[in-house]
A protein has these predicted regions:
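N-terminal secretory signal peptides and thylakoid transit peptides that target proteins
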Residues: 2-17
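Conserved active-site neighborhood of enzyme catalytic/cofactor-binding cores
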Residues: 316
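Beta-rich carbohydrate-recognition and catalytic domains
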Residues: 27-119, 123-189, 197-251, 259-310, ...
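Bacterial Sec-dependent signal peptides at the C-terminal "C-region" and cleavage site
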Residues: 18-30
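Helix-centric, low-specificity signal for extended rod-like, repetitive segments
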Residues: 1-2, 307
Length: 350
């Protein structure tokens, strides 16, 4: 396992120790209160198994929640000390979750996924006020993953690729479609969590990426395709850049969850400031390329003793029975003894 100060998780911890002040944000787009979820559940709804040989023995992370065949499902990324793999859980009520098993395992014979494969999104209904029903593409479900080349915690520059399934349990892994070395300086250090949105025949692949160096920065950009083969990075990337000195997202503007609300594109993302606070923020735009950051925190870290006292980050959002549900990775404690699992906040009281 790598020294924490050179891992993403370790970098967050190092920033937390720094304890610097941060400044305010910019102007808030109108009517963003409809995206707020101030009522935290306050407990983990999914956590590590703690079984030594299990794929999710140490942590669960990066929720992606959707609806299919009358039930809710969540993909999640697990870590077992070697690398990331992808699990699936199911629920009837968005609170009580049953693990269904590992659906994407590392493949020792693959140069891409021999140590890691983290699927973060499956093409779903884009609408904000929806349960996130899955949509088939060419008769199958279409997911998107990222994978790091080495064993350990996010070791080496990750790539992004597509994957296909007929039943959600068995996946065909395609070669990477985005590589860090093909991009600009803001993404040369490696690619992170992807989000794939189909809109009027065009596929928009949102992702965050990092610069090179031990104290890198993370920002969010987008690449688009009409055929799922040729991808063109937006020339104005990063579309969600780091904020100015002292802002909430001075270090990281990461892990996009992008939905459509009428004529609006709504970007949920997580931030890291120089004080080491990781929390979920919001940006809103009229197209996939020009989000304006909102001057408010959607999900903040909790008080000492809470499940998210260290970090509250990595959003996944669905709508159910008149309420917006905002799932996120909740972290308490300090690396390497932190507790990392999935929690949820919603727009009305529990």
């Amino acid at each position: 396992m790598p020294c924490p100060r050179f891992s993403r998780r370790g970098l967050l911890a190092a920033s937390l120790i720094a304890g610097l002040e941060h400044a305010g944000f910019g102007q808030t787009p109108a009517d963003t209160a409809r995206y707020e979820t101030p009522y935290k559940y306050g407990r983990l709804v999914l956590e590590a198994s703690k079984e030594p040989e299990a794929f999710d023995s140490r942590t669960v992370d990066c929720p992606f929640v959707f609806h299919h065949d009358g039930r809710f499902y969540m993909t999640y990324v697990s870590w077992d000390g070697t690398g990331y793999q992808t699990g699936l859980a199911s629920s009837n009520n968005l609170v009580d979750w049953k693990k269904e098993g590992c659906i994407l395992r590392r493949d020792p014979s693959s140069p891409v996924t021999r140590y890691n494969i983290a699927m973060n999104w499956i093409v779903r209904a884009n609408e904000m006020r929806s349960a996130g029903e899955l949509k088939k593409v060419r008769g199958r479900f279409l997911g998107v993953y990222h994978a790091y080349p080495n064993a350990g915690l996010e070791e080496g520059p990750a790539v992004i690729g597509l994957c296909w399934s007929s039943d959600l349990m068995h996946w065909e892994i395609a070669d990477p479609c985005l590589r860090p070395e093909d991009g600009a300086a803001w993404e040369n250090g490696g690619l992170y969590k992807p989000c794939l949105v189909e809109h009027r025949g065009t596929y928009h692949l949102f992702y965050n990426a990092k610069t090179k160096g031990a104290r890198w920065r993370e920002q969010t950009g987008v690449a688009s395709s009409n055929d799922l083969k040729s991808w063109k990075r937006y020339e104005g990337n990063p579309t969600i850049p780091n904020g100015p000195a002292g802002s909430w997202d001075e270090r990281f503007a990461s892990d996009p969850c992008v939905l459509v609300d009428g004529s609006r594109w709504v970007f949920f993302y997580y931030s890291l400031d120089t004080a080491g606070k990781a929390r979920d923020l919001l940006a809103v735009g009229t197209d996939p390329f020009h989000p304006a950051k909102a001057a408010r925190i959607l999900v903040d870290v909790g008080p000492p003793g809470s499940v998210d006292s260290t970090y509250a980050h990595k959003p996944s959002v669905v709508y159910h029975e008149g309420a917006l549900y905002h799932f996120y990775c909740a972290v308490s404690g300090k690396w390497p003894k932190e507790v990392r699992g999935i929690s949820v906040a919603r727009s009305r009281p529990w």
